[in-house]
UniProtKB/Swiss-Prot annotation:
Impact when changing residue 189 to P: In EDMD2; found also in a patient with limb-girdle muscular dystrophy; sporadic
Matches recorded under Pfam families: Filament, LTD
PANTHER family tied to this protein: LAMIN DM0-RELATED, PRELAMIN-A_C
Modified residues annotated as N-acetylmethionine in this record: 1
Effect of residue 125 to S: Found in patients with atrial fibrillation; uncertain significance
Consequence when changing residue 190 to Q: In EDMD2 and CMD1A; aberrant localization with decreased nuclear rim staining and increased formation of intranuclear foci
Protein name (database record): Prelamin-A/C
Stated family: Belongs to the intermediate filament family.
Organism of origin: Homo sapiens (Human)
Tissues where the protein occurs: In the arteries, prelamin-A/C accumulation is not observed in young healthy vessels but is prevalent in medial vascular smooth muscle cells (VSMCs) from aged individuals and in atherosclerotic lesions, where it often colocalizes with senescent and degenerate VSMCs. Prelamin-A/C expression increases with age and disease. In normal aging, the accumulation of prelamin-A/C is caused in part by the down-regulation of ZMPSTE24/FACE1 in response to oxidative stress.
Region of interest (Coil 1A), ranges: 34-70
Outcome, altering residue 650 to A: Partially inhibits tail cleavage
Crosslink site: Glycyl lysine isopeptide (Lys-Gly) (interchain with G-Cter in SUMO1): 597
């Protein structure tokens, strides 16, 4: 389409080509064309000015209305969030106070634990000394028992010898009695022989008297007869009679002397024999008495030693019983104190874990509030930048705390680059945490809820009758599977408990089917615990799913944002004494956009700096970590905690706020 100046130039060119013009005419025509062109430009400018004024009036009206709406919304939101921030600050103050109190209690409990440990060490030292003393006493007792057994064996030997000696003494006493009896018989025979000798002497005297009487009578008769005989033969008869008498007397005297000698010889021989037998018996009896006396002396000494050893043994046994009783009392006291302290430590750990969970929930709430406040701040800053309004003091302070990367992309009246969203990709990853305190461990948990696999890691069979598997998915109802009463898991064997919906075959003892449940359940936080028959948790495995939302853009600023995200994420893990919490993704439930990242402050959390509005990538990870207060021993804060990350979305300002957004 030709303009008026072009049409005029065409006409003038045609006229000039038809008729030649003078220079003055040409000059005037050019001036006329210039004036017409200026008039056309002025008319166009006036029309443009009028349209711009009309548009400006409409825009001013819209700005006024928008300012009124924004002022009303900002005032309401400011009041609401100031109240919420006040409550959050109070909650954080109370949590900080509670944490300080718990730290003081923890330090106190640790001091008590150290004291109890020192006392326990001392008691163990005393116990070791008592055990050493007990061993010495047992060795002494064994030596005394050996000496006692030796003394008893000697006593038995001496008793045997005493019994033999008593038998010999009895025999000797019997022989002595026999010898005494023989001596008495010999004495009786001697007396009898003496009596007989006396009788024979008396008889001999009597016979002598009789013979003398007879001799006198014979003499008298012979004398009488000799009177009658003649005197010649009287001498002959007298001599014959004297010879006969002398011969008879000599014979009688020889017989008596011979009988006396024989009797004396027999008596002296028997008396010598009896005396020798008595001497031998007296010697044997003396020796037996001496041996018996020595045996009695030895028996008395051994009995005294035995009684002394028995007294020492009784004293040692009494002392040993006292030591065992005191040792048992000390063990019971130590065991009771240790049980009480362990129970107190378990209660303290449970309270600490409960306080830590509450503190974690409060920090989650705080981080969500910080993200919402940051999102509102981004919206307000975007509107202020679009409308070229003066920033509020809060925005200035917020920009003053921003990182250098955000300052470079937002400062100096730079123009925000337009971005075009091409595609959105979500990635899910699982993190696992397992704990085992017995022989059986939870080896594998299916992400889709098809099965749970257990393994016996020991070298012994494990009876699992009436054991339970408890499955918890977030706030969903608890699922409980109970093993058969006679089920036993062999050493090194694996058992898989299938859900009914998995289509597996029931094949004990390696494959069990839970017919009452179609699935074990699936979700973002799956906790599987193995409970024994006494109700104690012996194994646990927790499966946490993290969803990462990644948006691909046309702009080349995505690499810068990813680089910034990587640097901030890596810098947060430099301290080896930090414990990271488990990963989460915060997404808007209505608009589908990830929540913006907040610059969380405080003693408990560490997050990355703010992201510039000109960045194109919307996948941002905010990692919160806790610094360990105590040592690395059991019962510290970081034992049962895992990483927690917040995956945030696009931080660029929106041109229009979404309606009914749960985050906004």
């Amino acid at each position: 389409m030709e303009t008026p100046s072009q049409r005029r130039a065409t006409r003038s060119g045609a006229q000039a080509s038809s008729t030649p013009l003078s220079p003055t005419r040409i000059t005037r025509l050019q001036e006329k064309e210039d004036l017409q062109e200026l008039n056309d430009r002025l008319a166009v400018y006036i029309d443009r000015v009028r349209s711009l004024e009309t548009e400006n009036a409409g825009l001013r009206l819209r700005i006024t209305e928008s300012e009124e709406v924004v002022s009303r919304e900002v005032s309401g939101i400011k009041a609401a969030y100031e109240a919420e921030l006040g409550d959050a600050r109070k909650t954080l103050d109370s949590v900080a106070k509670e944490r300080a109190r718990l730290q003081l209690e923890l330090s106190k409990v640790r001091e008590e634990f150290k004291e109890l440990k020192a006392r326990n060490t001392k008691k163990e030292g005393d116990l070791i000394a008592a055990q050493a003393r007990l061993k010495d006493l047992e060795a002494l007792l064994n030596s005394k028992e050996a000496a006692l057994s030796t003394a008893l064996s000697e006593k038995r030997t001496l008793e045997g010898e005493l019994h033999d000696l008593r038998g010999q003494v009895a025999k000797l006493e019997a022989a002595l009695g026999e010898a005494k009896k023989q001596l008495q018989d010999e004495m009786l025979r001697r007396v009898d022989a003496e009596n007989r000798l006396q009788t024979m002497k008396e008889e001999l005297d009597f016979q002598k008297n009789i013979y003398s009487e007879e001799l006198r009578e014979t003499k008298r008769r012979h004398e009488t007869r000799l009177v009658e005989i003649d005197n010649g033969k009287q001498r002959e008869f007298e001599s014959r009679l004297a010879d006969a008498l002398q011969e008879l007397r000599a014979q009688h005297e020889d017989q008596v002397e011979q009988y006396k000698k024989e009797l004396e010889k027999t008596y002296s021989a028997k008396l010598d024999n009896a005396r020798q037998s008595a001497e031998r018996n007296s010697n044997l009896v003396g020796a037996a008495h001496e041996e018996l006396q020595q045996s009695r002396i030895r028996i008395d000494s051994l009995s005294a030693q035995l009684s002394q050893l028995q007294k020492q043994l009784a004293a040692k046994e009494a002392k040993l019983r006292d030591l065992e009783d005191s040792l048992a009392r000390e063990r019971d006291t130590s065991r009771r104190l240790l049980a009480e302290k362990e129970r107190e430590m378990a209660e303290m750990r449970a309270r600490m874990q409960q306080q830590l969970d509450e503190y974690q929930e409060l920090l989650d709430i705080k981080l969500a509030l910080d993200m919402e406040i940051h999102a509102y701040r981004k919206l307000l800053e975007g509107e202020e930048e679009r409308l070229r309004l003066s920033p509020s003091p809060t925005s200035q302070r917020s920009r003053g705390r921003a990182s250098s990367h955000s300052s470079q992309t937002q400062g100096g009246g730079s123009v925000t680059k337009k971005r075009k969203l091409e595609s959105t990709e979500s990635r899910s990853s699982f993190s696992q945490h397992a704990r085992t305190s017995g022989r059986v461990a939870v080896e594998e948990v299916d992400e889709e809820g098809k099965f749970v696999r257990l393994r016996n890691k020991s070298n012994e069979d494990q009876s699992m009758g009436n054991w339970q598997i408890k499955r918890q998915n977030g706030d969903d109802p608890l699922l409980t599977y109970r093993f058969p009463p006679k089920f036993t898991l062999k050493a090194g064997q694996v058992v898989t408990i299938w859900a009914a919906g998995a289509g597996a075959t029931h094949s004990p003892p390696t494959d069990l089917v839970w017919k009452a449940q179609n699935t074990w359940g699936c979700g973002n936080s799956l906790r599987t615990a193995l409970i024994n028959s006494t109700g104690e948790e012996v194994a646990m495995r927790k499966l946490v799913r993290s969803v990462t939302v990644v948006e691909d853009d046309e702009d080349e600023d995505g690499d810068d944002l990813l680089h910034h995200h990587h640097g901030s994420h890596c810098s947060s893990s430099g301290d080896p004494a930090e414990y990271n919490l488990r990963s989460r993704t915060v997404l808007c439930g209505t608009c589908g956009q990830p929540a913006d990242k907040a610059s969380a402050s405080g003693s408990g959390a560490q997050v990355g700096g703010p992201i510039s509005s000109g960045s194109s990538a919307s996948s941002v990870t905010v990692t919160r970590s806790y610094r360990s207060v105590g040592g690395s021993g059991g019962g510290s804060f970081g034992d049962n905690l895992v990483t927690r990350s917040y995956l945030l979305g696009n931080s660029s300002p929106r041109t229009q706020s979404p309606q009914n957004c749960s985050i906004m």
